[in-house]
Design a protein with these regions (language model features):
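Conserved glycine-rich cofactor-binding loop
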Residues: 29-30
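Conserved glycine-rich Rossmann-like NAD(P)H-binding loop of the short-chain dehydrogenase/reductase
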Residues: 45-59
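Rossmann-fold cofactor-recognition segment
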Residues: 63-78
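Conserved NAD(P)H cofactor-binding loop of Rossmann-fold oxidoreductase domains
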Residues: 100-106
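Substrate-binding pocket helix/loop in short-chain dehydrogenase/reductase
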Residues: 108-109, 113-119
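Catalytic loop of short-chain dehydrogenase/reductase
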Residues: 144-169, 174-175, 179-182, 195
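C-terminal helical subdomain
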Residues: 186, 190-191, 206-238
Length: 238
């Protein structure tokens, strides 16, 4: 990997000027969310962090200057919907929400049990939807939502039917929501993150990953596919 988060993000004067000011990062204990939170903080954004691992979350919040933080469970959809109102209260207002939550799952469709399929749909689709649903009423014109889906939406491989279905459901939902919110001046960015080097596939909820090509650099990918679109004007980034 390259240097620290700020170095890889390529922080410039323009970036600092266009970075959202008050940001909720959901999934801040994961690799993508953690990198995004650190880069946004270095650009001067006031960030609130939400994540599954309470201990890691507290550590990351402390390293960013004792930022507001809240642990959540993706299966608690009401709790997911409540993250944005909590962040708005903690930060004073909310300009942007970054959602980087998910879990991988592998195996032919007939080998994936119903419980695993439900888990994949809940964590990869329903939980992010709930977060966004709770955030939309709080965002004013110029507000932005960035949600990580993945390139699997564009080319779902064999052996990942349930995982791909969940991510595709989320991407479809984001596309419609983006059109609905456009008149309000709120952008919804569908982040088609590439496969990254970071061990995500190895932590699958079911099955084992196939042989995968080398992943992209995480810091550079977060900058290109997530942070740059949030500061710019695109609604989908591949």
């Amino acid at each position: 990997m390259s240097g620290g988060p700020g170095e890889a993000a390529g922080v410039s004067g323009r970036d600092a000027e266009t970075a959202p000011a008050h940001v909720l990062v959901v999934g801040a204990t994961g690799m993508i969310g953690g990198l995004a939170a650190r880069a946004l903080h270095r650009r001067g954004a006031s960030v609130a962090l939400a994540g599954r691992n309470a201990e890691r979350l507290a550590d990351r919040a402390r390293l960013l200057g004792d930022r507001p933080h809240r642990a959540f469970d993706a299966y608690d959809l009401d709790g997911c919907a409540g993250l944005a109102p909590w962040a708005a209260r903690s930060l004073g207002r909310l300009d942007c929400v970054v959602v980087a939550v998910g879990v991988a799952g592998f195996g032919r469709a007939e080998l994936v049990g119903d419980a695993a399929a439900e888990h994949l749909m809940t964590v990869n689709a329903l939980a992010p939807m709930a977060v966004v649903r709770g955030a939309l009423p709080l965002l004013e014109a110029g507000g932005t939502v960035g949600v990580v889906t993945g390139v699997i939406v564009d080319a779902p491989p064999r052996g990942m039917a349930d995982y791909a279905a969940a991510k595709t459901a989320l991407a479809t939902w984001l596309g419609v929501v983006g059109r609905e919110q456009r008149a309000r001046g709120v952008r919804v960015v569908d982040v088609r993150m590439p496969h990254l080097d970071g061990g995500f596939a190895a932590r699958a909820v079911t099955g084992g990953p196939p042989t995968l090509p080398p992943g992209a650099d995480p810091e550079a990918s977060v900058e290109r596919h997530l942070l740059a679109p949030l500061a710019g004007g695109t609604e989908r980034n591949r």
